[in-house]
Curated annotation (Swiss-Prot):
Species per Swiss-Prot/TrEMBL record: Pseudomonas putida (strain W619)
Protein name: Phosphonoacetaldehyde hydrolase
Signal peptide as annotated in the record: none
Lineage: Bacteria, Pseudomonadati, Pseudomonadota, Gammaproteobacteria, Pseudomonadales
Protein family: Belongs to the HAD-like hydrolase superfamily. PhnX family.
GO molecular function per UniProt: magnesium ion binding; phosphoglycolate phosphatase activity; phosphonoacetaldehyde hydrolase activity
HAMAP family: PhnX
């Protein structure tokens, strides 16, 4: 039995917020702000976006390690946040997230048609998220009401490690019956999500405009001038540079062209780990 390179993609493994649903990735961001506020600690939207892509407990821990936020917490409680304090914030975050997730549950405009086309071309659609399963179940339910059902879903608490570790992406490979990680493309709007795909040995596509990095609504994105959009693209490309995505595109609606290019490269014998 001999090894041979895959010659075409078999699966796209997609993030959720900022990738397929919730243009601008507002659902988790706003709730982080509200959860900290319930402890009389101010966190801005921009600060809350910083660690996006991680599991939510890790996200809160990372925010609490930011010196400015830790100092605000110390002024209220007389100490910097411990892991138990992080858990207290997380336990307030969770019910708020479940309660308000529907507010930001709309599909990315055009995403459903794009994914339908990819499936017609033979791709399986896996997915994973920084949300825990109790939130993910609600996200999946709301997406199904809007016509989107992934072939597999992996929440951050269903594997030993969340992003940027590769476990969630690899859990999709196993569940979907994919025979080679190089036959998968991981699509995400965050650096931890791209690192997840890289470490899993997959092709990676970073989304520049639909997610956390740009942080605008669909209407805000559409209102940008050509000069503003180009400036934001340059800023966000630099943000992703260290995670080395194979491709950067504005939204998931450009993914079919990327898939076609990856298939061309695979047919030539190119592999994602080599680039």
């Amino acid at each position: 039995m001999n090894y041979s390179n895959p010659t075409q993609l078999q699966a796209a493994i997609l993030d959720w917020a900022g990738t397929v649903v919730d243009f601008g990735s507002f659902a988790p961001t706003q709730i982080f702000v509200e959860a900290f506020a319930e402890f009389d600690v101010q966190v801005s939207i921009e600060e809350a976006r910083g660690p996006m892509g991680m599991g939510k407990w890790d996200h809160i821990r990372t925010l609490c390690d930011v010196p400015e936020i830790a100092e605000r917490y110390r002024k209220v409680f007389g100490r910097t946040p411990t892991d138990d304090d992080v858990t207290d914030i997380y336990n307030r975050f969770m019910p708020l997230q479940i309660e308000k997730i529907a507010v930001h549950s709309a599909l990315i405009p055009g995403a459903l048609d794009t994914l339908t086309g990819l499936r017609q071309d033979g791709l399986k659609i896996g997915s994973c998220s920084g949300y825990p399963k109790v939130v993910m179940d609600k996200v999946v339910e709301l997406a199904a009401q809007n016509g989107y059902v992934a072939d597999h879903v992996v929440a951050t608490d269903e594997t030993p490690n969340g992003r940027p570790w590769p476990a969630q992406a690899l859990a999709n490979v196993i569940a979907l019956g994919i025979d080679d990680v190089a036959a998968c493309v991981k699509v995400d709007d965050t650096v931890p999500g791209i690192l997840e795909g890289r470490r899993a040995g997959m092709w990676t596509v970073a989304l520049v405009c639909s997610g956390n990095a740009l942080g605008l609504t669909w209407e805000g994105y559409q209102a940008l001038s050509a000069e503003q959009l180009e400036s934001e693209r340059k800023r966000i490309h630099a943000l992703f540079a260290g995670s080395r995505p194979h491709y950067l595109i504005d939204t998931i609606n450009e993914l079919p062209e990327v898939v076609a290019d990856i298939n061309r490269r695979l047919a030539k014998g190119e592999m994602p780990q080599a680039f």
